[in-house]
From Swiss-Prot:
Transmembrane annotation, as ranges: none
Keywords, sorted A to Z: ATP-binding, Coenzyme A biosynthesis, Cytoplasm, Kinase, Nucleotide-binding, Transferase
Highest taxon of source: Bacteria
GO molecular function: ATP binding; pantetheine kinase activity; pantothenate kinase activity; protein homodimerization activity
Coarse class of the protein's main subcellular location: cytoplasm
UniProt source species: Escherichia coli (strain K12)
High-level lineage: Bacteria, Pseudomonadati, Pseudomonadota, Gammaproteobacteria, Enterobacterales
Regulation: Regulated by feedback inhibition by CoA and its thioesters.
Name of the protein this chain belongs to: Pantothenate kinase
An annotated GO BP: coenzyme A biosynthetic process
SUPFAM superfamilies linked to this entry: P-loop containing nucleoside triphosphate hydrolases
């Protein structure tokens, strides 16, 4: 079978960086270099060029999809003779630990909020829907954080279901990476956004991923457009270790940090510890639960060195 025939048979349209960048059209750059610097993650290189060539075309595509969705809602309201409720357009962002999901989410939030048609863009991470540490300890799951069984999926599904049902005020729990736990009584209220960006490891998972907790509705059932941020495993491991080393010199030095003891490690000890955490927890979760969901995404961003996106695949 020829490459051309294989391309025709795939459910995705494939673009290299230059082809994708050309789809920006005339969308203006609405972020300054200072704003971009504030949006990037602790271990990522996010440049003006990256935003212009990757994220502006993506924001343009999403604007088309969102506008189409609003027109469809208007048609339904006309048919029913009703004044419709504000129903948010939900974008999910999945991918491995350390791949840069949070940066992608923050950049898209900033860009989409600047489109005149829809200014209210909320960003929620699924970390808040992890079971509290006390529950995880009781169930012997502290080393399984991020795995399907560590989440309160019923609460997460209810959260997105309520938003899609037009409930005006919906609360989401908030997670603190400092204390490595859900913040008690720290819920965030989400008030009828035009767009919700939902970022997390598990947002593309379905019933096959939860045999231990069978239920019939999943987050992915409520998502309008899903993004998977991808990268080769060797890069993911390197990024994870580098991020751990930066935390060792930064966040871990806070006496209130759950991982304060790691700040006392030598660099060699820290690298060894990070490697162990990667192999025994994060790599395992990637292979078993995250990577298998990649082909369910509407769009796949594949990164190379320095977190630069080199390929984009868009579902037909």
């Amino acid at each position: 079978m020829s490459i051309k025939e294989q391309t025709l048979m795939t459910p995705y349209l494939q673009f290299d960086r230059n082809q994708w960048a050309a789809l920006r059209d005339s969308v203006p750059m609405t972020l300054s270099e200072d704003e971009i610097a504030r949006l990037k993650g602790i271990n990522e290189d996010l440049s003006l060029e990256e935003v212009a060539e990757i994220y502006l075309p993506l924001s343009r595509l999403l604007n088309f999809y969102i506008s189409s969705n609003l027109r469809r809602q208007a048609v339904l309201e006309q048919f029913l003779g009703t004044n419709g409720q504000r129903i948010p357009y939900i974008i999910s962002i999945a991918g491995s630990v350390a791949v840069g999901k949070s940066t992608t989410a923050r950049v898209l939030q900033a860009l989409l909020s600047r489109w005149p048609e829809h200014r209210r863009v909320e960003l929620i991470t699924t970390d808040g829907f992890l079971h509290p540490n006390q529950v995880l300890k009781e169930r012997g799951l502290m080393k399984k954080k991020g795995f399907p069984e560590s989440y309160d999926m019923h609460r997460l599904v209810k959260f997105v279901s309520d938003l899609k049902s037009g409930v005006p005020n919906v609360t989401a729990p908030v997670y603190s990476h400092l204390i490595y736990d859900v913040i008690p009584d720290g819920d965030k209220t989400v008030v009828q956004p035009d767009i919700l960006i939902l970022e997390g490891l598990n947002v593309l998972q379905s019933g096959m991923d939860y045999p231990h907790d069978p239920h019939h509705v999943f987050v992915s059932d409520f998502v309008d457009f899903s993004i998977y941020v991808d990268a080769p495993e060797d890069l993911l491991q390197t990024w994870y270790i580098n991020r751990f080393l930066k935390f060792r010199e930064g966040a871990f030095t806070d006496p209130d940090s759950y991982f304060h003891n790691y700040a006392k490690l030598t660099k060699e000890e820290a690298i060894k510890t990070a490697m162990t955490l990667w192999k025994e927890i994060n790599w395992l979760n990637l292979k078993q639960n995250i990577l298998p969901t990649r082909e369910r995404a509407s769009l796949i961003l594949t990164k190379s060195a320095n977190h630069a996106v080199e390929e984009v695949r868009l579902r037909k």
